[in-house]
Amino acid sequence: VHEPGLNYSSDGRCKVFDASADGMVGGEGAAVIMVKRANDAIRDGDHIYALLRGIGLNNDGAEKSGFYAPSVKGQSEVISQALQEAKVDPQTIAYLEAHGTGTNLGDPVEILALSDAYRLHTDKTQFCAIGSVKSNIGHLDSAAGLAGCIKVALTLGRGEIPPTINYCEPNSA
């Protein structure tokens, strides 16, 4: 149920990163990926959609305004951690799949955290496309992260970035 300023969209549309975004939309689904060492997958003749080069994990617990609210500091730290572990220069990343829920609070915090983390490595701007599968299928709760991983793997394999729907004007917050 929509309540202004809270989590759910007023019109049933998830408008990730859009000025008119006012909440997320729930979705239903499950996601499964097979994770295997690259050498083993090559040896076994498996089709490789993507490689996971590094991960980051943290908890920004007390540094945020509420249970569902993200923090810029916590997200920026975990993004930096993942980039460092993967040994990836952010300037080489052409597409980023964001959590992007379409909420007034979450999307601007996520963009600011990404900007802060990337600025540690480069002064370049607008070199990396960004999207969120949630505009297409809604928020799948515990399957949301894997849905995003699957989208990225398919994007890499096909060399085409699917559009983020319901996006017209950038959220200036």
Where are these regions (language model features)?
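Condensing-enzyme catalytic core of the thiolase-fold
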Residues: 1-173
